[in-house]
């Protein structure tokens, strides 16, 4: 009898939790529609389909926000009801009132925030603690009428809570049924609740592969609509997540107390002293180089191709029999191609590679793409503004969505003329991260065909990434042939085969693109091919550090010879810009770079945890060779200082 009463209490409260969830979810979507209507002036050239996409994906991600409140009431009301069956409805209503007040407060605050920053809430909300908090508080009172606004929000929330109270008290079906007391029904209720929780957790999906979250929700071509897809709670969560990343900026090798010594070290390694531009009161002038004179003729097209998870190991001779990278290997072996095996990505994740290519800074876990300094002015080491001085336009092409890691905003802020991505087009196949790579490369070929101006194209692929959803059979992946060549202990590992197939697909797309461009525009192109990072897929359980972490660096084009890069060079992503300048810039051209050109003897590369030089590789554990230690400290300390504090050294 007691258990039956407890079940009835549990079931009663659980039904109200579900009713509360529906109310809050609908309310979140109502707020989103109001935002779309009242803030439409921020939108660009949009159509009905864009608006429907915004509402659809917004509704999905808001399931998570509504689920947060339901989780609280389930734990602190419904489960507690097994022990104390008093005032539970009031407790649920009280928790809901607090949650609704926060929603309403954020909804109003968003209008002011968006007007100021042209974005929904982000990490800058949490950076406010570094400001003069007292002055900030008074500004909010005087300029934004904080006190009066809060009173109005409280009154409005009270009205919403009153409606919620009536809604929760309303019984859809007043009659009880006998089957509700059966064991099968009780088990069914519990199972349904667990399945529903999973469905909400992944935003109207049952797996990560098809989930939606703040990192992949930029589904439209319009920045404003992408921001509105995030409800205000999700935007706050985005800001919190980014801030946590930034807070991890205390990283091995950063010694800001030694900033002068590190600047001087790089000034002596660059041409700053020879050009008499050294200045220890600031950073930029100490990073100047003077080009020795173009090694090859200036090209009409320069392509910097960054393959997602495009590791080096499948391109090595010891793995050639797998034929996973035959297209890129064929490029490497051409007479007019050169490469170095001693090459490291800038970090462990894609944003670090993007940051290195765009702004030329070493990774220190502070994400320059989210730093205020990156949007105040271009860095002296940024690639796009410098290559423009030689007569090139610049375009960034991404197979994903523009809102990912603020990639569009960052690229444009750092000097790129144009940005193109999956959001700009209707594409036939893809996943939560973007379109299949072949589509964006096809669009790029169309752009090249109609563009008569000398242009640098940076291309970032996306398909070789979870959830690994490319139709490999349709693409022609010889799965069974690869399986037969794998070590016996992994031949039945279907997940591994799928990942290897996506590497094969990336290689195929890159190879086909390079071949098509070369055939159509012979002798007019320079290609640089690399990967954003490795350390995702290997066929060994314990691969060597070299096979686990290194990425390729291949330079291909008319005029390139094998001996342009010697066997005694090593580097990483921050050396790419300088290398391109030395290849095509006229003698005497001045450029700014943290990393030295591979053609001028760069000899150190590292990511977040591993270093290499021309003869060895190892973990960053304090036992690095002295030249690695000094170079790493200088690169990282200056990158941290330049991103956080700016150019000047007090």
Show which residues each predicted segment covers.
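The feature marks either
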Residues: 221-225, 229-290, 298, 334, ...
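Residues that form generic nucleotide/phosphate-binding pockets
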Residues: 58, 62, 139, 162, ...
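Extended hydrophobic/aromatic-rich secondary-structure runs
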Residues: 139-142, 149-207, 267, 273, ...
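Generic alpha-helical secondary structure signal
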Residues: 8, 12, 49-50, 131-135, ...
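Solvent-exposed soluble domains appended to multi-pass membrane proteins
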Residues: 270-650
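Intrinsic-disorder-associated interaction segments
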Residues: 3, 7, 11, 252-259, ...
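Transmembrane and membrane-interface helices of multi-pass
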Residues: 2-250
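Short alpha-helical "patches" and their helix-cap loops
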Residues: 91, 248-258, 370-375, 594-596
């Amino acid at each position: 009898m007691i258990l039956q009463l407890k079940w009835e209490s549990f079931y009663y409260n659980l039904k109200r939790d579900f009713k509360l969830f529906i109310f809050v979810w609908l309310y979140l979507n109502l707020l989103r529609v109001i935002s779309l209507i009242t803030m439409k002036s921020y939108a660009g050239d949009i159509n009905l389909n864009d608006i429907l996409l915004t509402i659809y994906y917004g509704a999905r991600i808001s399931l998570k926000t509504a689920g947060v409140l339901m989780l609280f009431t389930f734990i602190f009301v419904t489960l507690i009801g097994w022990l104390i069956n008093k005032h539970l409805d009031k407790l649920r209503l009280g928790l809901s009132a607090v949650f609704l007040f926060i929603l309403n407060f954020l909804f109003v605050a968003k209008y002011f925030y968006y007007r100021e920053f042209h974005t929904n809430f982000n990490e800058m909300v949490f950076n406010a603690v570094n400001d003069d908090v007292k002055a900030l508080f008074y500004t909010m009172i005087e300029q934004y009428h904080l006190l009066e606004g809060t009173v109005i929000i409280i009154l409005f929330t009270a009205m919403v809570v009153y409606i919620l109270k009536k809604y929760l008290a309303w019984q859809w079906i007043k009659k009880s049924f006998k089957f509700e007391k059966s064991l099968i029904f009780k088990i069914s209720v519990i199972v349904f609740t667990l399945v529903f929780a999973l469905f909400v957790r992944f935003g109207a999906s049952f797996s990560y592969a098809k989930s939606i979250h703040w990192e992949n929700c930029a589904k439209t071509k319009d920045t404003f609509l992408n921001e509105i897809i995030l409800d205000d709670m999700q935007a706050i969560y985005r800001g919190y997540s980014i801030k946590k990343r930034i807070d991890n900026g205390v990283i091995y090798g950063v010694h800001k107390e030694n900033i002068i010594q590190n600047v001087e070290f790089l000034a002596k390694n660059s041409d700053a002293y020879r050009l008499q531009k050294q200045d220890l009161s600031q950073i930029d002038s100490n990073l100047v180089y003077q080009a020795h004179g173009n090694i090859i003729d200036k090209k009409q097209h320069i392509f910097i191709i960054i393959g997602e998870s495009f590791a080096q190991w499948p391109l090595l001779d010891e793995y050639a029999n797998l034929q996973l990278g035959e297209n890129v290997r064929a490029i490497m072996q051409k007479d007019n191609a050169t490469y170095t095996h001693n090459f490291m990505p800038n970090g462990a994740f894609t944003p670090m590679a993007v940051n290195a290519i765009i702004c030329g800074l070493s990774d220190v876990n502070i994400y320059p793409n989210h730093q205020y300094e990156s949007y105040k002015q271009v860095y002296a080491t940024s690639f796009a503004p410098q290559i423009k001085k030689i007569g090139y336009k610049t375009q960034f092409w991404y197979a994903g969505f523009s809102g990912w890691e603020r990639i569009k905003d960052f690229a444009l802020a750092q000097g790129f003329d144009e940005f193109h991505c999956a959001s700009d087009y209707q594409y036939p196949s893809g996943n939560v991260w973007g379109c299949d790579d072949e589509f964006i490369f096809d669009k790029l070929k169309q752009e090249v065909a109609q563009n008569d101006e000398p242009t640098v194209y940076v291309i970032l692929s996306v398909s070789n990434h979870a959830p690994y959803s490319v139709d490999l059979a349709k693409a022609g992946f010889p799965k069974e042939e690869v399986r037969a060549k794998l070590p016996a202990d992994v031949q039945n590992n279907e997940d591994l085969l799928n990942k290897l197939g996506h590497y094969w697909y990336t290689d195929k797309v890159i190879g086909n693109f390079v071949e098509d461009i070369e055939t159509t525009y012979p002798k007019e192109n320079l290609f640089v091919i690399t990967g954003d990072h490795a350390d995702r897929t290997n066929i060994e359980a314990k691969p060597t550090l070299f096979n686990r972490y290194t990425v390729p660096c291949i330079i291909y084009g008319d005029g390139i010879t094998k001996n342009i890069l010697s066997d005694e060079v090593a580097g990483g992503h921050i050396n790419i810009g300088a290398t391109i300048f030395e290849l095509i810039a006229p003698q005497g051209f001045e450029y700014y770079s943290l990393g030295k050109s591979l053609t001028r003897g760069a000899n150190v590369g590292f990511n977040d945890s591993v270093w290499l030089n021309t003869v060895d590789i190892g973990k960053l554990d304090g036992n690095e060779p002295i030249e690695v230690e000094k170079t790493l400290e200088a690169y990282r300390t200056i990158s941290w200082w330049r991103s956080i504090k700016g150019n000047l050294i007090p």
